[in-house]
Every structure is written in C-alpha cells, then in structure tokens.
A protein has these predicted regions:
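Glycine-rich phosphate-binding loop of ATP-dependent small-molecule kinases
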Residues: 1-188
Length: 188
C-alpha cells in the first residue's frame, strides 16, 4: 500500500490543496517544509528571519537549513506510518538526502506525484492567491523568479523519479475536482 509519497509541481500548482486530500484518503500526515518555515518566520526565530529574507526575494532556503529540519521530522514518531512530503525535495541533493534518511529508517518512497501545469496559468493563480491571502511572497516579479528557480532546480526531480519508476504524472490544469479524480484513480 502507498504510504510514503512526495508531491511535486510548480508554485501555485495546487500541491497543498491536493496534499490535504491525499493525506485524508491514505490516512497519513503531511510533511510540509513550507509550513515548517512559515511557523519559524511567524515565531521570529533566527532561522525564520533568514528564511523570510530569501523567500521574499524568490530564492530557495539553503539545503543545510532545510535538511536539518527534514531529518528530525522524518525520524519523529509522527511520520513512522507514512507521510506526504509537500515542498520537499526541491532539488536532486535534497532527494538524495531524503533517500538516505529513509534508508536509515529501513524504508523508501512509494510514489511521487507530479502536478504538471501551464506556467502562465500558475502566475495568474498565484496573483489571485496573493490578493486573497495577503502573501508577501506572491508579487509578480517574485512569482516569476520562483518559477525560474523551480524550472532550474526542481524540474530535474521529475526525471530522477521517472527513472526510479516512482513518478505519477498528473495533468494539473483542470479544476481542483478534475485533478483530484485523476490522482484518486492513479492511487487506487
């Protein structure tokens, strides 16, 4: 049974929305580096302040910071029955690190869901979300920079997981419900 997953997709592809549904369906917790970082930023920790500066410029938080958060979370009891990783890994180094941590735990990923979306549609989605949620990291220049960073650093993960025969490619351009129906059919 599928219990350890990663969800990939450009910023604004709907990863968080679909992650919640997948977690409910499979009865597993979500593992979100974005949520962990937002909590650190809200608490005003040193890590949170540094992360906020980088995120507001549209850059990724360095692997060294993320990796220490990820390792302690993956080794916690909360994720021992499975998880859905949302926002991690974002590059090949992080994927190798995650594989290593899971190997230490005598387990591995079961599947990787990739939400494939039209990038211009994503810009529109994110600008709309920025208005609704008042997110400082969703200005148009920052969005375009995040998409560029995604393309350069994160897209190689699609190839990596395809070669590992873990990739489930999903057309993410439909409605929330159409995308969800596609995901459900692939997971069953």
């Amino acid at each position: 049974m599928i219990k350890r997953l990663v969800i990939l997709g450009a910023p604004g592809a709907g990863k968080g929305t679909q992650a919640r549904r997948i977690c409910e369906l499979l009865d597993i917790p979500t593992f979100s580096t974005g949520a962990m970082l937002r909590a650190q930023m809200q608490e005003g920790t040193e890590l949170g302040i540094k992360a906020k500066e980088l995120i507001n410029r549209g850059e990724l938080v360095p692997d060294s910071i993320i990796s220490s958060l990820v390792e302690s979370e993956l080794k916690s009891e909360r994720f021992s029955r499975g998880f859905l990783a949302d926002g991690y890994p974002r590059n090949l180094e992080q994927a190798h690190f995650m594989d290593s941590v899971l190997k230490d735990l005598d387990t591995q990923l079961d599947a990787v869901i990739n939400l494939d979306v039209d990038l211009e549609d994503v810009v529109g989605r994110l600008l709309k979300r920025a208005e609704i949620e008042h997110r400082s990291d969703d200005t148009e220049p920052v969005i375009r920079r995040r998409l560029q960073v995604y393309h350069e650093q994160t897209e190689p993960l699609v190839r990596y997981y395809r070669e590992a025969k873990l990739l489930i490619n999903i057309d993410g351009n439909g409605s929330i419900y159409q995308v969800w129906d596609c995901i459900k059919s692939k997971l069953s």
